[in-house]
């Protein structure tokens, strides 16, 4: 009987003892989820950044065809410090966009509203809902011949190495293979790209005026300023 009780006790202790947990292979966990892109897809843009600054690219590894991604996931270059406000010629005050409400705390509190009636309060609310807005710092892409179209970019093989923060973009353009590596500085608002190709390619810089929109590419190319 004693032997039986002893055996049952040891069995119970063994059942309650959890096996030693294995360490997580973080590198394998991250790298097996690296996103891959094989087409010029407006919903498949990739980004590199450092938490304070980010740069989003198309399938070329730069921002060569921003118009293709305009209505998808736009190609942005934005930072935590890059903000802009439109002029305030009517001199709207913040308090003009606030209304007192009783939330049951024993006193009235100011709350930002969006009036529907067309009066000064609505205009003030509309202005403060738009301003300030994040600024697109500029488009940086390949300078290609005018007749080159997005469909001319073939054999796309692009991946984001999330462990090292590198976007590798391989493609052919007019039978010329290209390889572009895109990175962001881990602490500064800087990006770098390495281009390998048999044919020389230039780099273009375009600086848009902001739109103040909520769901657009933040690029106004019609403004004179």
Task: Give the location of each predicted region.
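C-terminal motif of bacterial Sec signal peptides marking the signal peptidase cleavage site
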Residues: 14-15
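Beta-sandwich/jelly-roll carbohydrate-recognition scaffolds of carbohydrate-active enzymes
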Residues: 21-225
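Sec-dependent signal peptide recognition
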Residues: 1-8
